[in-house]
Amino acid sequence: MDQNELKKLVGEEAVKFIEDGMTVGLGTGSTVKFMVDALGERVKNENLNIVGVPTSDRTAEQARSLGINVKSVDEVDHIDLTIDGADEISSDFQGIKGGGAAHLFEKIVATNSKKVMWIVDESKMVDHLGAFPLPLEVIPYGSKQVFKKLEKEGLHPEFRKNDAGEYVLTDSKNYVIDLHLGEIKHPHQLADYLIKQVGIVEQGLFLDMVNTVIVGRQNGPEVLTARP
């Protein structure tokens, strides 16, 4: 199976955990897209009654097009389960997210959820975090000063730009700075440092957060329990 087939596999496996009446956080990214497609099929074929809480404009648009009832995080009083992708997951189930520039909204939804599930193909499972650049969402005002400070700290920052050389904007119209770290030895310390920096709205380390991980492997989906 190629990578897309593995992503489709875990997306279809994940929706088996969604029950009638649930409020479900809908993540963002290529793997989640397959999951939302599969959820749309269940809504259509089984008349499944659920509320989806999307973490990006593009996920909201996809969900609505499939007939999924969509509400914002501020319109619901609870979220039973959030299903999202990840860019890296370490052996102790810590994660990096934000490759799709949605990590602020993703973290807001995840931290307000009873349970969090990540769905990934096997290439995302690593021993240590850091090979994937760590995304930061920063407000445009003063962003070059933030950049200079990160550079001075030896964190190898880079503004994320599109093919036209323009700054990539988040749904909140903020910039993204990626840190090219190679390996993150002390993720909790790094997260604490970054979030204290004025101008950084959120950072892409998702720590002590996930309950279940579904990994797409060549021999089928593997369901791992990270935390009760």
UniProtKB/Swiss-Prot annotation:
<comment type="pathway">
    <text>Carbohydrate degradation; pentose phosphate pathway; D-ribose 5-phosphate from D-ribulose 5-phosphate (non-oxidative stage): step 1/1.</text>
</comment>
<feature type="active site" description="Proton acceptor">
    <location>
        <position position="106"/>
    </location>
</feature>
<protein>
    <recommendedName>
        <fullName>Ribose-5-phosphate isomerase A</fullName>
        <ecNumber>5.3.1.6</ecNumber>
    </recommendedName>
</protein>
<feature type="binding site">
    <location>
        <begin position="28"/>
        <end position="31"/>
    </location>
    <ligand>
        <name>substrate</name>
    </ligand>
</feature>
<dbReference type="InterPro" id="IPR037171">
    <property type="entry name" value="NagB/RpiA_transferase-like"/>
</dbReference>
<feature type="binding site">
    <location>
        <begin position="97"/>
        <end position="100"/>
    </location>
    <ligand>
        <name>substrate</name>
    </ligand>
</feature>
<dbReference type="GO" id="GO:0005829">
    <property type="term" value="C:cytosol"/>
</dbReference>
<feature type="binding site">
    <location>
        <begin position="84"/>
        <end position="87"/>
    </location>
    <ligand>
        <name>substrate</name>
    </ligand>
</feature>
<dbReference type="GO" id="GO:0009052">
    <property type="term" value="P:pentose-phosphate shunt, non-oxidative branch"/>
</dbReference>
<dbReference type="GO" id="GO:0004751">
    <property type="term" value="F:ribose-5-phosphate isomerase activity"/>
</dbReference>
<comment type="subunit">
    <text>Homodimer.</text>
</comment>
<dbReference type="InterPro" id="IPR020672">
    <property type="entry name" value="Ribose5P_isomerase_typA_subgr"/>
</dbReference>
<dbReference type="InterPro" id="IPR004788">
    <property type="entry name" value="Ribose5P_isomerase_type_A"/>
</dbReference>
<dbReference type="GO" id="GO:0006014">
    <property type="term" value="P:D-ribose metabolic process"/>
</dbReference>
<comment type="function">
    <text>Catalyzes the reversible conversion of ribose-5-phosphate to ribulose 5-phosphate.</text>
</comment>
<keyword id="KW-0413">Isomerase</keyword>
<comment type="similarity">
    <text>Belongs to the ribose 5-phosphate isomerase family.</text>
</comment>
<feature type="binding site">
    <location>
        <position position="124"/>
    </location>
    <ligand>
        <name>substrate</name>
    </ligand>
</feature>
<dbReference type="Pfam" id="PF06026">
    <property type="entry name" value="Rib_5-P_isom_A"/>
</dbReference>
